[in-house]
Amino acid sequence: MKYLPFVCFVIFSTAGFAETGKLNRESNDYKYSSLGLHLTESGKSGFSINLSIELPGAFYATLERKADGVDFKSESYDKVVDTARLGAHMGVGDLIGSMSAGDVKLKIKNLFDVFAEVGIKTSDFDGERFNFEGNDSYASFLAGIRFGNSNTWEGKIFLDASKEAIIKDSGNPVCKALFCPPYDAELSDDMDKKFGIGVIYNINNRSALFLEASSSKVTENLFKLGY
């Protein structure tokens, strides 16, 4: 994924210019409540809406709707993906706790946040030209770390694992001649593991700019730019 090195450079070079305490909160006080609108690029341009709500304790919930284009043969279609997940986060120091080696005790600081999410994902294609084989709802998992200064620049590294809905030709010439779906939509045989990185610039306590890139073995690589 050719843009990943550039995004990595942006994350680490801009972190050096961060203003400590700009928003008057701890540098590792990462927020998990947000409402965002993102522009996406994955072969075709699209958009996504994301809502994240912090719950009691270390838990939070996320909802996302993503719509973009899919090319199949000589035609283009819209694909809508809805995702709902329950997540939990914790500082790495709190997660691992104190480590002991004989008489030597090591205290691990909360240098970054560890997070994990699990939920369901559904996919749908536009029009009546598709017949979805099987269940269009499937499990979705996401896990990663957040690091940097929550007052200014933050970075994120994550792994997103779920099956993807793909298009295939039904191969039925009679069906193609009549009013019935000539194409089938089905889930990929294996989980698609997307590795991604992101950068967030916190403008103030209510606003932030967001850039994310992730790779995929089943679909096109994905880029997100949002607010």
Locate each region found by the language model.
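Outer-membrane beta-barrel transmembrane domain signature
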Residues: 21-22, 58, 90-97, 105-217, ...
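A short local loop/turn or secondary-structure capping micro-motif enriched for an aromatic residue
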Residues: 69-71, 217-220
